[in-house]
């Protein structure tokens, strides 16, 4: 009887670290699953800029050649300008008329990019050619 009790105690003592390890592994697995689901959700989001970029190109009356990198660079200027001033309409005003609005030039000035204006004008011409 004493031997049986001793075996039972040893078994319980051996199970305690196993239970602790199981809980830790369960926590790690849960964290991995949560992170994986968040990453996949973010990657397939319909608000993904790459998904909307070409549509936006036509929405703002661009009639030239769609160049993803040029469009993204010019759009980034408008995003940065919006982030600087936090005016609700500024992003769309900056992009209007395929980046040919006075707001775009104002954003270049505000972001201290006016010395690169000629380069940006060439980019605008590529996107906005008729």
Curated annotation (Swiss-Prot):
GO biological processes: circadian rhythm; neuropeptide signaling pathway
What are the disulfide bonds? 62-98, 78-94, 81-107
- PTM Leucine amide: list the residues: 127
What tissues has this protein been observed in?
A: Brain and corpus cardiacum.
Task: Name where it's found.
Answer: Secreted
One Gene Ontology cellular component annotation? Answer: extracellular region
Keywords linked to the UniProt accession: Amidation, Cleavage on pair of basic residues, Disulfide bond, Hormone, Neuropeptide, Secreted, Signal
| PANTHER family (UniProt xref) | ION TRANSPORT PEPTIDE, ISOFORM C (PTHR35981:SF2)
Q: What does this protein do?
A: Stimulates salt and water reabsorption and inhibits acid secretion in the ileum of S.gregaria.
Q: Which family does it belong to?
A: Belongs to the arthropod CHH/MIH/GIH/VIH hormone family.
- Please identify the protein, giving its name as recorded: Ion transport peptide
Organism equals Schistocerca gregaria (Desert locust)
The beginning of the lineage is:
Eukaryota, Metazoa, Ecdysozoa, Arthropoda, Hexapoda
């Amino acid at each position: 009887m004493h031997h049986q009790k001793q075996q039972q105690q040893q078994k319980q003592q051996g199970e305690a670290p196993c239970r602790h390890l199981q809980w830790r592994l369960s926590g790690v697995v849960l964290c991995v699953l949560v992170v994986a689901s968040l990453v996949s959700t973010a990657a397939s989001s319909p608000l993904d800029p790459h998904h909307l970029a070409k549509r936006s190109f036509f929405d703002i009356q661009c009639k030239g050649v769609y160049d993803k990198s040029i469009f993204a660079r010019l759009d980034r200027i408008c995003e940065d300008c919006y982030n600087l001033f936090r005016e609700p309409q500024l992003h769309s005003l900056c992009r209007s008329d395929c980046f040919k609005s006075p707001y775009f030039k104002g954003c270049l000035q505000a972001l201290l990019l006016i010395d690169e204006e000629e380069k940006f004008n060439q980019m605008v011409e590529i996107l906005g050619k008729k």
